[in-house]
C-alpha cells in the first residue's frame, strides 16, 4: 500500500521472433528492397505488410522453424544482424513495431487496459554491453562451449540448475540478457523499491 506504480507492457520485440518474421517476409516477398544487398537508398516509410499479414507471418514462420533447420538458422542469423544494427532489418523491425503497437494499443484500449510505458526488450539493448562487461569484470560470467554464461544455482536449490546463457556462441543476446538489461534500465530510471 502507498506505492507509486509504473506499468510497462514490456514487448517481446528483440528476439528470435523478429528474425522469424524477417525471414518469412523474405520468402513471401523476396523482391522487397530490404533483401537486396546492393540497395543503398532510403527504405520505404510504408510497411510492407498489414497487421493481418503480420498475424499470419509469425505463426507460419514459427512452425516452419520447427520443421526446417535451415530456415531456423536463417532466422537466427537475421536476429543477430538485427541486434547488431543491420540497417535493412532495422527498417523492417521499425515497421513491425509501428504496425504491432498501433494494433496492441487499440486492443488494450478496448479492454480499458493502460500502461505508463510501452517499452520492449529492444529498449534494454544499450545496457547489454555494459551488463556483459560488468559480469565479466566481476568474474561472474565465463565462456562455456563458445557461449557466455553465469552460474545461477544456489546451495539451497532442490535441483541442479544449469548456468544462464547471457550471450550465445553466435554473439546474439537472449531473453535473460535483455531482461537483465531491463532491470538495469529500471534501476537507473526509477530506482524501484519493488518489482512485480
Language model segments and positions:
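NTP-dependent nucleotidyl-transfer catalytic core
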Residues: 1-196
